[in-house]
Amino acid sequence: MLDHNYAVPRCLVYRKRLLCSSSRLPLCLFAAAFIACLAACGGSTKSSVPGPPPGTQHLYINGATGQAFQFALPLTGSTPSATLSLPTASDVSAVAVDTTGNVAVGAFGGTISIFNAPITGSGSASVTFKNGTSTLVDNLAFNSAGDLFATTNSNTINVFTHPLTSASTPSQVITSVNLTTGVGVALDSANNLIVSNSPSPAGSNLLVYAPPYTGLPIATAVVPAASYRQMAISGTQLFVVNSNVSASKIDVYSLPITAASAPAFLISNGLFGGSVSGNGVALDSSSNLYAGLSGNLGTTDSGGIRIYVPPFSGAPSVANGVFGFTLAVGK
Protein backbone atom coordinates (compact mmCIF):
# COMPACT_ATOMS: atom_id res chain seq x y z
CA MET A 1 0.00 0.00 0.00
CA LEU A 2 1.33 3.41 -0.90
CA ASP A 3 0.87 6.67 0.99
CA HIS A 4 0.54 9.74 -1.18
CA ASN A 5 1.21 13.20 0.18
CA TYR A 6 0.22 16.10 -2.04
CA ALA A 7 1.46 19.63 -1.58
CA VAL A 8 -0.97 22.24 -2.90
CA PRO A 9 0.16 25.82 -3.60
CA ARG A 10 -1.84 28.47 -1.79
CA CYS A 11 -1.53 32.16 -1.04
CA LEU A 12 -2.36 33.23 2.51
CA VAL A 13 -4.29 36.49 2.86
CA TYR A 14 -4.46 38.55 6.03
CA ARG A 15 -6.71 41.64 6.06
CA LYS A 16 -6.75 41.52 2.27
CA ARG A 17 -2.96 41.87 2.07
CA LEU A 18 -0.60 39.20 0.75
CA LEU A 19 1.79 38.00 3.42
CA CYS A 20 4.63 38.02 0.84
CA SER A 21 6.19 41.43 1.30
CA SER A 22 7.94 43.14 -1.58
CA SER A 23 11.34 42.39 -0.07
CA ARG A 24 10.53 38.67 0.05
CA LEU A 25 8.65 38.46 -3.23
CA PRO A 26 11.38 36.61 -5.20
CA LEU A 27 11.68 33.99 -2.45
CA CYS A 28 7.91 33.56 -2.24
CA LEU A 29 7.62 33.21 -6.01
CA PHE A 30 10.33 30.54 -5.99
CA ALA A 31 8.63 28.67 -3.14
CA ALA A 32 5.26 28.83 -4.90
CA ALA A 33 6.78 27.51 -8.12
CA PHE A 34 8.52 24.69 -6.24
CA ILE A 35 5.32 23.67 -4.43
CA ALA A 36 3.37 23.79 -7.68
CA CYS A 37 5.96 21.51 -9.26
CA LEU A 38 5.56 19.02 -6.42
CA ALA A 39 1.80 19.07 -6.84
CA ALA A 40 2.08 18.54 -10.59
CA CYS A 41 4.37 15.57 -10.01
CA GLY A 42 1.97 13.99 -7.54
CA GLY A 43 3.78 14.97 -4.36
CA SER A 44 6.07 12.62 -2.49
CA THR A 45 5.41 8.89 -2.54
CA LYS A 46 6.80 6.29 -0.18
CA SER A 47 6.07 2.65 0.53
CA SER A 48 4.46 1.88 3.87
CA VAL A 49 6.26 -1.49 3.86
CA PRO A 50 9.95 -1.55 4.84
CA GLY A 51 12.42 -2.80 2.29
CA PRO A 52 15.56 -2.11 0.28
CA PRO A 53 15.66 0.42 -2.59
CA PRO A 54 13.10 -0.69 -5.24
CA GLY A 55 14.46 -2.89 -8.01
CA THR A 56 17.53 -4.07 -6.11
CA GLN A 57 16.47 -7.26 -4.31
CA HIS A 58 13.91 -10.07 -4.18
CA LEU A 59 12.42 -12.27 -1.48
CA TYR A 60 12.31 -16.02 -2.20
CA ILE A 61 9.99 -18.33 -0.25
CA ASN A 62 8.50 -21.80 -0.43
CA GLY A 63 5.31 -21.84 -2.49
CA ALA A 64 2.78 -24.42 -3.61
CA THR A 65 3.93 -28.03 -4.01
CA GLY A 66 6.76 -28.15 -6.53
CA GLN A 67 7.28 -24.39 -6.53
CA ALA A 68 9.16 -21.54 -4.91
CA PHE A 69 8.03 -17.92 -5.28
CA GLN A 70 9.94 -14.72 -5.95
CA PHE A 71 8.61 -11.35 -4.71
CA ALA A 72 10.02 -7.95 -5.61
CA LEU A 73 11.10 -5.86 -2.63
CA PRO A 74 9.74 -3.80 -0.98
CA LEU A 75 6.66 -6.03 -0.71
CA THR A 76 3.68 -4.12 -2.10
CA GLY A 77 1.32 -7.00 -2.90
CA SER A 78 0.72 -10.72 -2.64
CA THR A 79 1.36 -11.64 -6.29
CA PRO A 80 4.76 -13.26 -6.99
CA SER A 81 7.00 -11.62 -9.56
CA ALA A 82 8.23 -15.07 -10.63
CA THR A 83 7.52 -18.75 -10.04
CA LEU A 84 10.36 -21.27 -9.80
CA SER A 85 9.13 -24.74 -10.79
CA LEU A 86 10.88 -27.86 -9.51
CA PRO A 87 11.30 -30.88 -11.81
CA THR A 88 9.25 -33.00 -9.37
CA ALA A 89 6.12 -32.36 -7.32
CA SER A 90 7.97 -32.07 -4.02
CA ASP A 91 7.48 -29.50 -1.28
CA VAL A 92 10.19 -26.87 -0.94
CA SER A 93 12.19 -27.11 2.29
CA ALA A 94 15.02 -24.59 1.80
CA VAL A 95 16.09 -21.65 -0.40
CA ALA A 96 19.33 -19.70 -0.80
CA VAL A 97 20.65 -17.03 -3.19
CA ASP A 98 24.28 -16.55 -4.24
CA THR A 99 25.97 -13.20 -4.84
CA THR A 100 25.06 -13.20 -8.55
CA GLY A 101 21.37 -14.00 -8.04
CA ASN A 102 21.38 -17.74 -8.76
CA VAL A 103 18.87 -19.52 -6.51
CA ALA A 104 19.20 -22.93 -4.87
CA VAL A 105 15.99 -24.67 -3.84
CA GLY A 106 15.98 -27.74 -1.60
CA ALA A 107 13.03 -30.12 -1.49
CA PHE A 108 11.71 -32.87 0.73
CA GLY A 109 13.12 -36.09 -0.66
CA GLY A 110 16.65 -34.70 -0.75
CA THR A 111 16.94 -32.91 -4.10
CA ILE A 112 18.58 -29.53 -4.72
CA SER A 113 17.68 -27.52 -7.83
CA ILE A 114 19.58 -24.52 -9.19
CA PHE A 115 17.84 -21.66 -11.02
CA ASN A 116 20.14 -19.39 -13.00
CA ALA A 117 19.83 -15.61 -12.80
CA PRO A 118 18.13 -13.51 -13.96
CA ILE A 119 14.80 -15.03 -12.92
CA THR A 120 11.75 -13.32 -14.41
CA GLY A 121 8.17 -14.47 -14.85
CA SER A 122 8.73 -18.19 -14.53
CA GLY A 123 11.79 -20.36 -14.33
CA SER A 124 12.83 -23.97 -14.60
CA ALA A 125 15.80 -25.54 -12.89
CA SER A 126 19.02 -25.62 -14.90
CA VAL A 127 20.41 -28.49 -12.82
CA THR A 128 19.14 -30.81 -10.09
CA PHE A 129 21.20 -33.11 -7.88
CA LYS A 130 20.87 -35.05 -4.63
CA ASN A 131 21.94 -33.84 -1.20
CA GLY A 132 24.37 -36.72 -0.97
CA THR A 133 22.64 -39.72 0.57
CA SER A 134 20.27 -37.59 2.65
CA THR A 135 16.54 -37.48 2.00
CA LEU A 136 16.32 -34.05 3.65
CA VAL A 137 17.53 -30.56 2.78
CA ASP A 138 16.89 -28.57 5.93
CA ASN A 139 18.77 -25.38 5.04
CA LEU A 140 21.12 -24.03 2.39
CA ALA A 141 23.80 -21.34 2.27
CA PHE A 142 26.26 -20.12 -0.37
CA ASN A 143 29.73 -18.82 0.36
CA SER A 144 31.26 -15.94 -1.60
CA ALA A 145 32.82 -18.38 -4.11
CA GLY A 146 29.47 -19.93 -4.97
CA ASP A 147 30.03 -23.18 -3.07
CA LEU A 148 26.84 -24.54 -1.51
CA PHE A 149 26.44 -25.85 2.05
CA ALA A 150 23.44 -28.10 2.80
CA THR A 151 22.29 -29.41 6.17
CA THR A 152 20.76 -32.87 6.45
CA ASN A 153 18.95 -32.75 9.83
CA SER A 154 21.59 -35.19 11.04
CA ASN A 155 25.27 -35.15 12.01
CA THR A 156 26.57 -34.21 8.55
CA ILE A 157 26.69 -31.08 6.39
CA ASN A 158 27.33 -31.51 2.67
CA VAL A 159 29.47 -29.09 0.67
CA PHE A 160 29.05 -28.80 -3.11
CA THR A 161 31.82 -26.99 -4.98
CA HIS A 162 31.09 -24.42 -7.68
CA PRO A 163 30.27 -24.83 -10.56
CA LEU A 164 27.16 -26.86 -9.72
CA THR A 165 25.96 -29.44 -12.24
CA SER A 166 23.48 -32.30 -12.39
CA ALA A 167 26.43 -34.58 -11.58
CA SER A 168 27.38 -32.65 -8.42
CA THR A 169 28.18 -34.75 -5.37
CA PRO A 170 29.49 -33.59 -2.00
CA SER A 171 33.11 -32.47 -2.27
CA GLN A 172 33.28 -32.46 1.52
CA VAL A 173 31.14 -33.88 4.31
CA ILE A 174 31.49 -31.87 7.51
CA THR A 175 30.94 -33.67 10.79
CA SER A 176 32.19 -33.74 14.38
CA VAL A 177 31.43 -35.49 17.64
CA ASN A 178 29.32 -32.57 18.89
CA LEU A 179 27.25 -32.20 15.71
CA THR A 180 24.07 -34.13 16.44
CA THR A 181 21.24 -32.58 14.41
CA GLY A 182 22.36 -29.73 12.17
CA VAL A 183 19.45 -27.61 10.99
CA GLY A 184 20.35 -24.02 10.12
CA VAL A 185 23.54 -22.90 8.42
CA ALA A 186 25.18 -19.52 7.81
CA LEU A 187 28.61 -18.17 6.87
CA ASP A 188 30.14 -15.04 8.37
CA SER A 189 32.47 -12.58 6.63
CA ALA A 190 35.49 -14.77 7.45
CA ASN A 191 33.74 -17.85 5.97
CA ASN A 192 33.34 -19.42 9.40
CA LEU A 193 30.49 -21.91 9.17
CA ILE A 194 27.83 -21.43 11.86
CA VAL A 195 25.39 -24.30 12.43
CA SER A 196 22.27 -24.39 14.58
CA ASN A 197 22.43 -27.74 16.32
CA SER A 198 20.01 -29.72 18.48
CA PRO A 199 22.08 -32.08 20.63
CA SER A 200 18.92 -33.28 22.39
CA PRO A 201 15.19 -32.54 22.55
CA ALA A 202 15.98 -30.45 25.64
CA GLY A 203 17.58 -27.56 23.75
CA SER A 204 19.78 -26.18 20.98
CA ASN A 205 23.19 -24.58 20.61
CA LEU A 206 25.50 -23.12 17.97
CA LEU A 207 28.58 -24.71 16.44
CA VAL A 208 31.23 -22.68 14.59
CA TYR A 209 33.62 -24.39 12.16
CA ALA A 210 36.64 -22.46 10.92
CA PRO A 211 37.86 -23.11 7.35
CA PRO A 212 38.66 -25.73 6.08
CA TYR A 213 35.96 -27.15 8.41
CA THR A 214 37.94 -30.23 9.45
CA GLY A 215 38.63 -29.31 13.08
CA LEU A 216 36.51 -29.44 16.19
CA PRO A 217 34.05 -26.52 16.21
CA ILE A 218 33.47 -23.89 18.86
CA ALA A 219 30.32 -24.91 20.74
CA THR A 220 28.08 -22.59 22.74
CA ALA A 221 26.15 -23.74 25.79
CA VAL A 222 22.82 -25.40 25.13
CA VAL A 223 19.87 -23.01 25.40
CA PRO A 224 17.20 -24.93 27.36
CA ALA A 225 13.91 -25.61 25.56
CA ALA A 226 15.23 -23.94 22.40
CA SER A 227 14.63 -25.34 18.92
CA TYR A 228 16.99 -23.44 16.63
CA ARG A 229 16.17 -23.32 12.93
CA GLN A 230 17.14 -20.95 10.09
CA MET A 231 19.75 -18.22 10.62
CA ALA A 232 20.81 -14.97 8.96
CA ILE A 233 23.70 -12.55 9.42
CA SER A 234 23.80 -8.76 9.21
CA GLY A 235 27.12 -7.10 10.03
CA THR A 236 28.04 -8.15 13.56
CA GLN A 237 24.71 -9.75 14.44
CA LEU A 238 23.48 -13.32 14.00
CA PHE A 239 19.70 -13.88 13.96
CA VAL A 240 18.55 -17.38 14.93
CA VAL A 241 14.93 -18.55 14.79
CA ASN A 242 13.94 -20.29 18.01
CA SER A 243 10.93 -22.30 16.86
CA ASN A 244 8.36 -23.22 19.48
CA VAL A 245 4.61 -23.44 18.93
CA SER A 246 2.93 -20.45 20.61
CA ALA A 247 6.28 -19.24 21.96
CA SER A 248 8.57 -18.62 18.99
CA LYS A 249 11.19 -15.89 19.00
CA ILE A 250 14.39 -14.83 17.28
CA ASP A 251 17.54 -14.98 19.39
CA VAL A 252 20.12 -12.36 18.37
CA TYR A 253 23.82 -13.05 19.00
CA SER A 254 26.78 -10.70 18.67
CA LEU A 255 29.56 -11.86 16.35
CA PRO A 256 32.06 -13.42 16.55
CA ILE A 257 30.57 -16.46 18.28
CA THR A 258 32.62 -17.86 21.17
CA ALA A 259 32.03 -20.70 23.60
CA ALA A 260 30.69 -18.12 26.06
CA SER A 261 28.24 -16.53 23.60
CA ALA A 262 24.61 -16.15 24.64
CA PRO A 263 21.74 -14.22 23.04
CA ALA A 264 22.26 -10.46 23.39
CA PHE A 265 18.53 -9.85 22.99
CA LEU A 266 15.48 -11.49 21.50
CA ILE A 267 12.65 -10.57 19.16
CA SER A 268 9.20 -11.98 19.88
CA ASN A 269 6.78 -9.17 18.99
CA GLY A 270 4.39 -10.59 16.37
CA LEU A 271 5.73 -14.15 16.67
CA PHE A 272 4.13 -15.20 19.94
CA GLY A 273 0.77 -16.91 20.49
CA GLY A 274 -1.86 -18.90 18.63
CA SER A 275 -0.62 -21.95 16.74
CA VAL A 276 2.23 -20.05 15.12
CA SER A 277 5.73 -21.49 14.90
CA GLY A 278 8.62 -19.43 13.58
CA ASN A 279 11.00 -21.06 11.14
CA GLY A 280 12.55 -18.81 8.48
CA VAL A 281 14.58 -15.62 8.66
CA ALA A 282 16.34 -13.38 6.13
CA LEU A 283 17.75 -9.84 5.91
CA ASP A 284 17.76 -7.34 3.06
CA SER A 285 20.48 -4.84 2.15
CA SER A 286 18.87 -2.22 4.41
CA SER A 287 19.08 -4.64 7.38
CA ASN A 288 15.30 -5.13 7.52
CA LEU A 289 14.51 -8.52 9.04
CA TYR A 290 11.98 -10.94 7.48
CA ALA A 291 10.50 -13.73 9.62
CA GLY A 292 8.57 -16.65 8.16
CA LEU A 293 5.90 -18.51 10.11
CA SER A 294 3.83 -21.65 9.98
CA GLY A 295 0.43 -21.64 11.66
CA ASN A 296 -1.40 -18.45 12.60
CA LEU A 297 -2.01 -16.04 15.45
CA GLY A 298 -5.79 -15.98 15.20
CA THR A 299 -8.72 -15.44 12.87
CA THR A 300 -7.44 -12.08 11.63
CA ASP A 301 -3.85 -13.21 11.04
CA SER A 302 -3.08 -16.28 8.98
CA GLY A 303 0.68 -16.11 9.36
CA GLY A 304 1.90 -13.49 6.89
CA ILE A 305 5.63 -12.78 6.82
CA ARG A 306 6.81 -10.30 9.45
CA ILE A 307 9.17 -7.43 8.60
CA TYR A 308 11.16 -5.77 11.39
CA VAL A 309 13.08 -2.50 11.08
CA PRO A 310 16.34 -1.93 13.01
CA PRO A 311 16.79 -1.79 15.99
CA PHE A 312 13.98 -4.42 15.93
CA SER A 313 12.24 -3.14 19.05
CA GLY A 314 8.98 -2.08 17.40
CA ALA A 315 6.01 -4.02 16.11
CA PRO A 316 6.59 -5.64 12.71
CA SER A 317 4.85 -4.88 9.46
CA VAL A 318 2.79 -7.85 8.27
CA ALA A 319 3.00 -8.85 4.61
CA ASN A 320 -0.62 -9.94 4.30
CA GLY A 321 -1.08 -12.70 1.75
CA VAL A 322 2.64 -13.56 1.58
CA PHE A 323 3.38 -16.78 3.46
CA GLY A 324 6.55 -18.79 3.81
CA PHE A 325 8.43 -20.81 6.39
CA THR A 326 11.79 -20.79 4.59
CA LEU A 327 13.16 -17.51 3.25
CA ALA A 328 16.05 -15.98 1.34
CA VAL A 329 16.77 -12.47 0.08
CA GLY A 330 19.01 -11.68 -2.87
CA LYS A 331 19.13 -10.21 -6.34
Regions found by a protein language model. Give the residues of each.
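Bacterial Sec-dependent N-terminal signal peptides
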Residues: 2-17, 23-25, 29-61, 65
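Flexible "stalk/tail and boundary" regions
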Residues: 46-331
